[in-house]
Amino acid sequence: MKLKDIAGLIKGSVEGDNELEIKGIGKIESAGSDEITFISNPKYEKYFNSTSAGAVILSDEFDIKTGREDISVIRVPDPYNSFLILLEYFEKEKESNLAGISENVHTGKNTIFGENVFVADFVNFGDDCKIGNGTKIYSNTTIEKNCEIGSGCKIYPNVTIYRNCIIGNNVIIHSGTVIGSDGFGFARQDDGTYKKIPQTGRVVIEDDVEIGSNCSIDRATLGETKICKGVKLDNQIQVAHNVIIGENTVIAAQVGIAGSTKIGKRCMIGGQSGIVGHIEICDDVIIGAAVGVSKSIEKPGLYTGYRIKPHREDLKTEISIRNIPKLEDRIRALENKISE
């Protein structure tokens, strides 16, 4: 791809060789002469003088203090987001030749495929599934009966989607994830045993959601477990039955969310946090890493601590704990004075 075409794609202006052929994307520290990179963080400006990249995307304000005539430059207002556009383009190019349905696919009755669908070897479909235009489904994935998957989705190898689940458009699901497995519902009997509660609901995943590898999203006991539009889930996250995660919320790895909890819009939840069931978290909440959320959160803000509290309170508690040894020393000194 010529540099002038890249500039057109990201709406930038070229300083240097318009005809330079770019074959890939690299880091500023290690990019080669046929690769393009970018600088958006001032910490990386020092690498401009030493990089071997053929071209660099820079902000309009970036001041080139040394003469590097061997490097071509594309000027843009926002190098970071321009680079994201370029990454998306190159990623799509890698998959542009993927099309068609393998002969080694098991298709149930009345399964409907949209246009330009790609299905790899050994994918299994149950009856009455519907797959939208341009969706790509990779090897060894199982999609049970009555599932609907929208357009432009990517479902990577070894994903399992249980019956009756609904997945929107432009959803990405990474390997090993299970969607629609039974919720953890058991009724304790008088004799101390447990009787399984049938999980009759479904999972609904709205548009533009990305789900990392080895996540588990349980079906509802009744109704729906819902992952709303724009949610991003990291790897190894447990979402229990009847949970609702609001739009554009992001959740880091190894978070567990117990049943029937409702999380608001635009929340950010740190890794290894645990959230109890049957509570509500309002919009615009930030939860730190490894936090135990044991009650509803009604006000936006940052919350931290093993026993969750507003961040300022948590800091005060930490300071008090650190001061305990000093207090002990003062108490001993006072005791010694009194005993004298």
Q: Where would I find each of the regions flagged by the language model?
A:
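Terminal amphipathic alpha-helical/low-complexity segments used for targeting or macromolecular assembly
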Residues: 1-104, 170, 176-177, 182-196, ...
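Structural signal for interior beta-strand "rungs" in well-ordered beta-sheet cores
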Residues: 38, 100-310
